[in-house]
């Protein structure tokens, strides 16, 4: 029986028609003289009715079917009796009286219920992913993914972009994370790398005159995993010639507005606010600030320059900072709750956490006796503290204070229920430093990647004051999650060689890793820039999920394995010999 309709295409306008349906048995209910079956296909559910008065043979076969059997049915669409309508179903006003049924495939009892809101170990869900994806919420996530990617393609096509695929097997040029390496059988002892991004190829496409490129690209990074990371992931990759930062930012805002409206029915306001990197780090403790709530961190370093409180004075004398966070309405916190925040601060690198409880007629704190009245007054004024508030302090090197205060801010936002979960709050973070100093390796590293252009006015201080150079970079952040990052690129060979030199790369190493790119820059390279978005992260936020694994068809676990296929796995000795490889025992 070849189906004539999907389940949810059936409505009151088709009542009286003969229909043929295919799908899975969702539930089966035997009411004595009648058997009711909810038939599920990708579109949804329709109720089937088996009656011996309609077709006795079909009724007896329905007695034998079970959940997840795949069946084909033929019958007549009817209105449900008024008292039995189901307002929770799109097809809740109709049902099909079955005249013929065929079992296309029986099914074993599933290891978990095929329904939403199940409490099942995620590894079990991943082992039986083909069953997990039958659940409505997982199906809906994949349908949302399809709509979002289609919106991306349609939008960029309408703006003159062309989709070009770049190589999966390429040269190893590590961009921060470790590469996944693929041994070559044809060239023994040599390896391809799976791309961490199409960065170099898309820039070469600009040299080739493609002008507007995009790709829904698969990327691979051998790094430690967490809820929003996978070893293989998808990104929307874009690059344009003859543009500046403003052109890219405006285009992306228009695209995001269209994606959210067409794919999810959500209206977002543009233009998005912009926040300089330094301000984000000072006021929110993160370059991925969540702006759905306040609790801004304030700078106290200048006003406390002459403080006698040793903890603050020591931090300032060693080139550090003192900052404070006014936890509004947290003055009722117990000492145990405050100590828990202090422990969290220490876990994240702080030496401790000073605090002041602001009460109606007094201040409770172990540090007020070390502060002058003027300092206390300035602290209260700068933080806007009132009775019932709790002031938390961070005093250390700027990067440590930013990290710790940012984590405390998020914890307090969650604890006090300040985060508007349904709100979509976009922000551009701009004016990044081009470089950051690695204390362990005693050299500068690229904040984003080594192809990001410095501000033109900063090129002259690249050698003398590299830490002060600002990048022509921009990140798009949504609700505290980085959606994507981009920049205007270096497009001249001498500037790119200068960047490699500042990063401590010798001319020989630069030629070995990037010689093909440097040579391409000698044949007329247009100014260009672009951006890349994590499709999985975007979908995680759109779908309201806590992990990218819920919006990917076949993700890996947090140990980078696949319970269903048992990848990664060993390979045969013959395969290793063909690749000139030998496994060394640990």
Curated annotation (Swiss-Prot):
Pfam families: GAD (PF02938), tRNA-synt_2 (PF00152), tRNA_anti-codon (PF01336). Homodimer. Disulfide bonds: none annotated. The gene is aspS. It is an enzyme of class 6 (ligase). ATP binds at residues 221-223, 230, 482, 534-537. Keywords: Aminoacyl-tRNA synthetase, ATP-binding, Cytoplasm, Ligase, Nucleotide-binding, Protein biosynthesis. This is Aspartate--tRNA(Asp/Asn) ligase. It is found in: Cytoplasm. Its EC number is 6.1.1.23. Aspartyl-tRNA synthetase with relaxed tRNA specificity since it is able to aspartylate not only its cognate tRNA(Asp) but also tRNA(Asn). Reaction proceeds in two steps: L-aspartate is first activated by ATP to form Asp-AMP and then transferred to the acceptor end of tRNA(Asp/Asn). The lineage of its organism: Bacteria, Bacillati, Bacillota, Clostridia, Eubacteriales. Residues 199-202 are annotated as: Aspartate.
């Amino acid at each position: 029986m070849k189906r004539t309709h999907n389940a949810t295409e059936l409505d009151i306008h088709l009542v009286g028609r003969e229909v043929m349906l295919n799908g899975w048995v969702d539930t089966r209910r035997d009411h004595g003289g009648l058997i009711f079956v909810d038939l599920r296909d990708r579109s949804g559910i329709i109720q089937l009715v088996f009656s011996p008065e309609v077709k006795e043979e079909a009724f007896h076969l329905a007695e034998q079917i079970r959940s997840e059997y795949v069946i084909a049915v033929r019958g007549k669409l009817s209105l449900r009796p008024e008292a039995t309508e189901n307002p929770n179903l799109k097809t809740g006003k109709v049902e099909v009286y079955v005249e013929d049924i065929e079992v296309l495939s029986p099914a074993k009892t599933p290891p978990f219920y095929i329904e939403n809101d199940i409490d099942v170990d995620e590894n079990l869900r991943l082992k039986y992913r083909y069953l997990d994806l039958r659940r409505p919420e997982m199906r809906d996530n994949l349908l949302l993914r399809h709509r979002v990617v289609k919106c991306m393609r349609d939008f960029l096509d309408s703006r003159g972009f062309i989709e070009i695929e770049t190589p999966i097997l390429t040269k190893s040029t590590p961009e921060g994370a470790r590469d996944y390496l693929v041994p070559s059988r044809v060239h023994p002892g040599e390896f391809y790398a799976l791309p961490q991004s199409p960065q170099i190829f898309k820039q070469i496409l600009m040299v080739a005159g493609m002008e507007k490129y995009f790709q829904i690209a698969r990327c691979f990074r051998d790094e430690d995993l967490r809820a929003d990371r996978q070893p293989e992931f998808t990104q929307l990759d874009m690059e344009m010639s003859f543009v500046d930062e403003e052109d890219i930012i405006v285009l992306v805002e228009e695209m995001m507005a269209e994606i959210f409206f067409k794919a999810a029915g959500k209206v977002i306001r543009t233009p998005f606010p912009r926040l300089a990197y330094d301000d984000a780090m000072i006021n929110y403790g993160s370059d991925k600030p969540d702006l759905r709530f306040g609790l801004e961190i304030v700078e106290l370093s200048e006003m406390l320059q002459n403080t006698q409180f040793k903890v603050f004075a020591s931090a300032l004398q060693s080139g550090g900072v003192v900052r404070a966070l006014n936890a509004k309405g947290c003055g009722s916190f117990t000492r145990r709750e405050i100590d828990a925040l202090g422990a969290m601060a220490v876990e994240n690198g702080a030496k401790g956490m000073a605090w002041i409880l602001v009460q109606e007629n007094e201040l409770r704190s172990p540090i007020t006796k070390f502060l002058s009245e003027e300092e206390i007054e300035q602290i209260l004024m700068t933080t806007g503290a009132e009775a019932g508030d709790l002031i938390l302090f961070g005093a250390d090197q700027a990067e440590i204070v930013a990290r710790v205060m940012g984590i405390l801010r998020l914890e307090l936002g969650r604890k006090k229920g300040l985060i508007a979960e349904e709100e979509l709050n976009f922000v551009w973070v701009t004016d990044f430093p081009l470089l950051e100093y690695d204390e362990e390796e005693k050299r500068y590293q690229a904040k984003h990647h080594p192809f990001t252009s410095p501000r033109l006015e900063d090129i002259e201080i690249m050698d003398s004051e590299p830490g002060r150079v600002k990048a022509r970079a921009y990140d798009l952040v949504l609700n505290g999650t980085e959606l994507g990052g981009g920049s205007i690129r270096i497009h001249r060979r001498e500037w790119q060689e200068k960047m490699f030199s500042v990063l401590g790369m010798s001319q020989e190493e630069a030629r070995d890793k990037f010689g093909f790119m440097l040579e391409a820059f000698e044949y007329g390279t247009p100014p260009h820039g672009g951006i890349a978005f994590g499709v999985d992260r975007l979908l995680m936020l759109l779908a309201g999920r806590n992990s990218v694994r819920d919006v990917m068809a076949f993700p890996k676990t947090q140990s980078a394995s696949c319970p269903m296929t048992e990848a990664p796995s060993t390979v045969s000795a013959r395969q290793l010999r063909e690749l000139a490889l030998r496994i060394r025992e640990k």
